């Protein structure tokens, strides 16, 4: 049995998509894990192929990276076109996609479709430009799950622990 882990691509205009794919490409794949990548599918696939041209794509948005990691893209807002000219620029369009990608991943986790959610870097400015009140992933998680709005993000790395 495999465990499915969801990853929201973050802001398509930023480093999120590249961070996600490089992390998956460079890690030793675990055959017990499959990945669900949430974001604009065509754009996400183009980033993946630019970093891993030997990856295989089949049955729509399913993939097998050259290192053997497997998963699928979960297409978010296919009505919105993310193009390379948007990279590096905060916009309402990229903010909408960022927000909807993370929200869908959280909903899928709450419904048991995936076991966990990770999210790539985001840009609050982009989401706010879309007219969506957003102060980061922790508040989005609590709002989507119907929890208290008082949340704390805990970052742990090496000997460093930060609560924000």
Which residues are covered by each model-predicted region?
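A generic local secondary-structure boundary/capping motif
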Residues: 142, 151-155
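N-terminal beta-strand/alpha-helix entry module and adjacent surface
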Residues: 132, 142-145
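Ligand-binding "clamshell"
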Residues: 137, 148-152
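Contiguous, glycine/small-aliphatic-enriched amphipathic segments in soluble metabolic enzymes
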Residues: 1-138
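Ligand-binding beta-strand-loop-alpha-helix segment within the catalytic cores
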Residues: 66, 154-164
């Amino acid at each position: 049995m495999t465990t499915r882990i969801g990853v929201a691509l973050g802001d398509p205009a930023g480093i999120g998509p590249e961070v996600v794919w490089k992390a998956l490409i460079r890690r030793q794949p675990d055959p017990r894990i499959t990945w669900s990548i949430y974001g604009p599918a065509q754009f996400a696939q183009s980033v993946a192929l630019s970093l891993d041209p030997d990856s295989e794509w089949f049955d729509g948005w399913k993939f097998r990276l050259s290192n053997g990691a497997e998963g699928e893209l979960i297409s978010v807002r296919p009505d919105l076109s993310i193009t390379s000219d948007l990279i590096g620029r905060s916009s309402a369009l990229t903010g909408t996609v960022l927000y909807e990608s993370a929200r869908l991943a959280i909903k899928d986790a709450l419904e048991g479709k995936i076991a966990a959610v990770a999210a790539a870097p985001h840009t609050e400015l982009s989401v706010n430009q879309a007219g969506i009140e957003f102060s980061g992933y922790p508040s989005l998680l609590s709002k989507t799950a119907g929890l208290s709005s008082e949340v704390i993000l805990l970052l742990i790395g090496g000997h460093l622990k930060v609560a924000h």
